[in-house]
């Protein structure tokens, strides 16, 4: 039954933003630094996008960007008809996915296990040691890997002494070893550093959840499964979303430094392909087209990952 009572709708006033020269003067330092950041972004991130025009031209440095012959999508057709580029895409995707999965799982596992260490001194020592490889350049890391996996290196000596092999293996002459070597190098170098954010997420979990699990008789593994991992799931999803777009950034330094003619068919990535065409052979148009392809695919991967995350409610 309606009582005939009409309720007045109260309008919510939207906050108005007033520009004040006095406030601007007070925030002068902040505005100056903000302006510097904006200018930096325009100069180094947006203006270089004009170079994408080279992908649609038969670019010659002598003619310049605005006077080179326009060829449309011819360079892209040439790119995708090149069997080498298709192989490079395979290598980049394979190494990117392997590195993403292996380093992702390794960082989560390391953070969870390190959180279970009760000895404070031991825990901090392990943390510090695990961070150190991140600060080494890839040149140093590849040098260490070369020495360790050489014919007289520690790995071959260990395998021979354990009678696993009879003769030393030339790891850098066999294609089947290259991707695992790259994956191991990434895990060794970045696991400790990548685990920092997971350790921070674990410390933010409500301790009462662990206490309740202990009352219910849960052991360490049960707490990890039902408390720790669900507690850091949002962090995992966010980092996964951020890293999916970097799948095609499988690397350049380590592949370039460890690669050689014997493993070239599995070591070349898109970045190395761009270097070979754009710098070594001087075909800037092909190099730019390959770079655009990489950027577009990365954006598509981010959008897809974002949609999947939304559907899963994360």
Indicate where each model-derived feature is located:
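Short, Lys/Arg-rich, polar N-terminal cytosolic tail immediately upstream
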Residues: 1-24
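A structural signal for multi-pass alpha-helical bundles of membrane permease subunits
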Residues: 22-314
